[in-house]
Amino acid sequence: MKLSTVLLSAGLASTTLAQFSNSTSASSTDVTSSSSISTSSGSVTITSSEAPESDNGTSTAAPTETSTEAPTTAIPTNGTSTEAPTTAIPTNGTSTEAPTDTTTEAPTTALPTNGTSTEAPTDTTTEAPTTGLPTNGTTSAFPPTTSLPPSNTTTTPPYNPSTDYTTDYTVVTEYTTYCPEPTTFTTNGKTYTVTEPTTLTITDCPCTIEKPTTTSTTEYTVVTEYTTYCPEPTTFTTNGKTYTVTEPTTLTITDCPCTIEKSEAPESSVPVTESKGTTTKETGVTTKQTTANPSLTVSTVVPVSSSASSHSVVINSNGANVVVPGALGLAGVAMLFL
């Protein structure tokens, strides 16, 4: 009961002081809004500041009430040293003090372990047991291996240049042969023999012809009489010596036997007639060689006469004879180049 009386008296005192402060600020024009009430334990202090002269008492600012807490009033204690309790102003259900932000930790609840350990399991590496293989009385755990020969073996004979050979195969679309000598060739298992100029058609193509390597030879013809025509020089070689004839003369060659080299062109098929009546046809690249008879080794150059020759001789103003050859002359010139 006594405590309730003290609290009620303190509330009335604080209300009176608030009204007194408000009336003082409203009635006086010399007091500014900077008046403040400082409360302490058992005392009330009112501080006022005069307005400056320049205001002329025209300050319209409303006084600011800076104290929101109720002052504490000392109650006579009847000779006791009991301090007056602090009375809080009702806040109409609101708190004027800032709430204290307290962090509430979640309670830690231990889970039932059912007889197991709650600690994290330790990762341990378990090595596989090593099992020793039976050695059967030997020092090695594995039986000895036996070397076996390969299942498929091939034997390569050593290279022998005298017996080994290679065959060159050429695929051709045209094949040319020269007569009168027969030409034989084999293609696709068939053998063909050509004895005269003809066109041979092979239907089972593609065909491959085996072509042997040929060696060319040189044909030599022995003559007993040799005819040349002037004024063009005639040059020939026999027994390693070269002779040049520039005018009609008789040339005797003593170092017999003598041979004259004659080359043939495989493209020409014109018979070549010599002075002794021998007729030959070309045989491709194949030539023959004949040795001369020592008794027939004289080569004679016959002078040109207008009665015995079909040539016509024209006198040139430059001093040179111009020869117009006839048929016999062409044959003789052809014989020189053969």
Curated annotation (Swiss-Prot):
It is a lipid-anchor; GPI-anchor. A lipid is attached at residue 318 (GPI-anchor amidated asparagine). Residues 169-262 are annotated as: 2 X 43 AA repeats. One of its GO terms (biological process) is fungal-type cell wall organization. Residues 1-18 form the signal peptide. The N-terminus is blocked. The GPI-anchor is attached to the protein in the endoplasmic reticulum and serves to target the protein to the cell surface. There, the glucosamine-inositol phospholipid moiety is cleaved off and the GPI-modified mannoprotein is covalently attached via its lipidless GPI glycan remnant to the 1,6-beta-glucan of the outer cell wall layer. Keywords: Cell wall, Glycoprotein, GPI-anchor, Lipoprotein, Membrane, Repeat, Secreted, Signal. GO terms for molecular function: structural constituent of cell wall. The number of the intragenic tandem repeats varies between different S.cerevisiae strains. This is Cell wall protein SED1. It comes from Saccharomyces cerevisiae (strain ATCC 204508 / S288c) (Baker's yeast).
